[in-house]
Every structure is written in structure tokens, then in C-alpha cells.
Amino acid sequence: MTSYEILCLLSALSLVISLISSRLHRWQQTITITALALGLSLVILAAGKIFGVSVYSTLVTDLEQLDFKALLLNGMLGFLLFAGALQIKLNVLKQQRWEIFVLAFVGTLISTLVIGGLLYLLSGFLGLQLNFSYCLLFGALISPTDPIAVLAIIKQLGAPEDIAIQVEGESLFNDGIGLVIFVAISQVAFSTEPLTVAGVSGLFIREALGGLLYGGILAAMLHGMLHFSEERTQYLLMTLLVPSAGYVGADMLGVSGPLAMVASGIIIGNVSVPRLLKESEWEHLDSFWLLIESFFNSLLFLLLGLLLLLIHFDAELWWFMLLAVPIVLIGRIISIYLPYFGFRRFRRYNSYAEKILVWGGLRGGLALAMAMSLPTGVSILAGSNIDLRELLMVMTYAVVVFSILVQGTTIPSLIDKSNAEHEAQRKP
């Protein structure tokens, strides 16, 4: 089958699973889709063992034709980030701007260093001492909370507005920051040319600040198009230009596409839409992007479950899989509680804020896509048969599955408690 045919069949399968999950009201839809897809993968694996590998091999071969990294990083990610940013209320975002800035920028750096440091120490304890730059690579790809997974769950659970905007704002911005850090560390780890601090810093500044500036330019261009357009029915199609052609442009310019999508989405949603569109057109725009977001979310979480078929679980990697989850949680705890130690000196917060930010820091397809982008054939040790990409893929997948199935299913109780406290504080 061609990649197009595979994508069409997967889209149909995601719709069927979405219909099933809509009847199972116990879990949020994206969690149900992931769980059902994982179950389907296990059935396929078992069938391959019992009835032979022919069917299993055919399915794996077909799935491998899909470039998951390109499909997510260069395709779905731009649309999903833009859709999420359109819903962000700028007046609420401004109230939490320093918290979001610190959590997204400083928190991601702290988490990267803590996770990388812990992995370096524990790998030595296990007798497979990893290069420190490889450990930092894992820290960089797993530290950003996945905006796709986070927004899909937080929106439906109804957390208090101040906590929700922190979770949503952090997840929208820190994935772009995480990608920039990941690219910088990748150059340090794999480049054959000597790198300088100035060179790496310049890359970071160009990607991050350039992405935000480019996003503002995209928003201004779309604003002008909407303003001068006489054919009002074209406004929906015009918004598609930003995450499609706009994202390609960011890649060509060498700036962060994710940050550009977030910046342009926030500006368009808070400036262009209220000023240039009628209320009925505004509602149509919301419905249009909700449809796109829902479709891509269903397809993405289906793919996350089916990726189990493509990952090779070597016996030597089990300890790293088991240690990955607590290492990442420790990094998340430190990167949240340390900034909040300073935040609480200046402002009062819900007592569940840190807990929700820690436990709501879900990981998803973004981390897996970054892991898949690593080169193959790089051994973790001289003379070792363990491939670095395979190791980081296995560890990342363990964290992603845990965060979606365990954290995603248990965070509603924390949000319920925070809502109860919020309501109690509002009563006279």
C-alpha cells in the first residue's frame, strides 16, 4: 500500500475507535483511543506469535512507510498548535505571563539538566555509562510537555482558569523551546565540527526569537488579508495558510515553526478575529478548527498506540525503561516546585497548582518524533550492540504510555479538588 492509502485507512480506524470511545464515558477520549490502540497492537503481536509472522510483518512494513516524525513535526504539529493558540485568552495569559515564561523557558532547561544528570548517574550504576551529551538529549526531548496531549485533556476537565492557563501556556511554548534545545544538543553530540558557546547560543536565539518574530509577521499578513478580502467566505481557508505554508516558511528560514504557530495563533485569536469577523463567522471559525483539532488528535493518539509494533524491546533495555518514568517525574517535580518557591513569595495560588502542573505534564507524540529523528547506527558504548536511537525510543515510549494512561486517568481527581478549593475561596 502507498502512504496515502495507509493514512486513509488509519483515519477511518481512528474514526471507528473515536465512536467506540465516545460510548465509554469513563475516560477522556484521547486516553481511550490510546488504550484501545495499544490493546489492538498487543492482539496483533500475539496473533503474529501464534499464527506466524506474515500478517504481522505486512502491518509493520506498511506502518514503517509512514514517516511519523515528518507527519507530526512537519504536518500535524503546526495545525494543532495553531488551533490551541487560537483559544488562548490574551488578557488571562498576561496575568500569568511571568509564570508561563519561567516554566516554559527556565523550567524546561532545569528539567533537561536534572533528567540528563540522573540518567548519566544511573547508567553508570547499571554498568552502561552513557555519554553525558546523550543523556542531555533524552532530557531535552522528554522535558517539554506535549501540548497536543495536555490541551486535549485539560480542556475537557475544566481546571480553575489560573491553573489551566499556566498548563496550556507552558505546554504551548515549552515544546518550541524543547525543540530548540534538542537541536542545539544534537549538534553538540553528533557534529564533527568544533562548536562554540556563542554558536550554540546564536542557534537558540535565532530559532526561539526568530520563531516568535516570524509568527507575528504571519499574523500581520493574515490580518491584512482578512481586512482587504471582499469574499468573506474565504476567511476559513485563509487561516489554513498559517500552519501550512507558514510552517514551511519557518523551516526554510531556520526559525522555530512551533513557536511561530503559537505566536500567530494568539495574535489572530485575540486581535484579528474580534476586530474583523462577525460573531457568526467567529463561531464558524471555532467550529472549523475544533474539527481539525479533533481529527488530528484522534489520528495521532491512534498512531501512538500502534507505534508499539515498531519498537524493539531488547532485554538489555528493560532497566532503562523502568527507570525512565521516575527519572522524568523527578525532573518535572524539581522544574515546577523550584520556580513556585519564588512565585509564592509574590502571589497566592491554589494549593493544588504545583501538583496539577507536575501530574498534568503529559508527554506524547512530540517526544517520540524527536527520538525518531535521531540518527541510527550510533552505539551507546564502544563495542556495544545497543543503538542510541533504539534506547531513547524505548525509554520515551515508556514515559509516553505512563503519562497518558496513568497520569491522564488520575489527574481528574486533582482537578476536582482544586475546583472545590477554588469555589470555597470565592464564597464570602
For the regions a protein language model found, what residue spans apply to each?
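Transmembrane helical cores of multi-pass secondary ion antiporters/exchangers
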Residues: 1-428
